[in-house]
Amino acid sequence: MFVAPAFAQEADHTAGETHTETGVAEGGHEGGFPPFLVETYPSQLLWLAITFGLFYLFLKRVVLPRIAGILEVRSDRIAQDLDQAARMKEDADAAVAAYEQELAEARKKAAAIAQEARDTAKAEAAAERRKVESGLDSKLKEAEARIALIKDTALSDVGTIAEETAAAIVQELVGGKVDKASLSAAVKAVQQQ
């Protein structure tokens, strides 16, 4: 029976009868609190089993599949995020490697340009030095030629002056004239010593 006899109505009321007093029958207090009565245990256990079964079915068919779906979606999202993070890390590593390679190539190119500039500067400096040296050599040769010309002129003038002076000295000392050819030969002999 689904309803315990303690809950059943004990007295029938007629339709037109009014109650003047409300009260509890004397016999209703003997049993105690209905959930604690042994006579109501089978009914309580039956409803407990039905309620637990319905709750179990509700959890099994409705709540747990939703939770499992949510967990699966979250797991898939986490896996996708991890895959995306791995791809982004690979892309970042590739970008870093490309950057480092380009940087190394730029350094090599800069070193080559600097070396080329140094070599060009050295070559230009050497060419300029050779040009200056050749200019100085030609000026030195011209100067030496002028000096030799001036020296020869001076020496020829000295020779002439020496000849004239020797002629004057001989004329004063000896009182006679000396031959110009012998004076020239004597002066040249002295100059060559």
UniProtKB/Swiss-Prot annotation:
Leader peptide range in chain numbering: none
Membrane topology classification: Single-pass membrane protein
Location of the region described as Disordered in the Swiss-Prot/TrEMBL record: 9-28
MF annotations from Gene Ontology: proton-transporting ATP synthase activity, rotational mechanism; proton-transporting ATPase activity, rotational mechanism
Top-level lineage group: Bacteria
UniProt keyword list: ATP synthesis, Cell inner membrane, Cell membrane, CF(0), Hydrogen ion transport, Ion transport, Membrane, Transmembrane, Transmembrane helix, Transport
InterPro entries linked to this entry: ATP_synth_b/b'su_bac/chlpt, ATP_synthase_B_chain
Subcellular location: Cell inner membrane
Transmembrane segments: 40-59
GO cellular component: plasma membrane; proton-transporting ATP synthase complex
Chief subcellular location: membrane
Biased composition (Basic and acidic residues): 10-20
Annotated family: Belongs to the ATPase B chain family.
Purpose of the protein: F(1)F(0) ATP synthase produces ATP from ADP in the presence of a proton or sodium gradient. F-type ATPases consist of two structural domains, F(1) containing the extramembraneous catalytic core and F(0) containing the membrane proton channel, linked together by a central stalk and a peripheral stalk. During catalysis, ATP synthesis in the catalytic domain of F(1) is coupled via a rotary mechanism of the central stalk subunits to proton translocation.
Quaternary assembly: F-type ATPases have 2 components, F(1) - the catalytic core - and F(0) - the membrane proton channel. F(1) has five subunits: alpha(3), beta(3), gamma(1), delta(1), epsilon(1). F(0) has three main subunits: a(1), b(2) and c(10-14). The alpha and beta chains form an alternating ring which encloses part of the gamma chain. F(1) is attached to F(0) by a central stalk formed by the gamma and epsilon chains, while a peripheral stalk is formed by the delta and b chains.
The protein, known as: ATP synthase subunit b 1
Species per Swiss-Prot/TrEMBL record: Chelativorans sp. (strain BNC1)
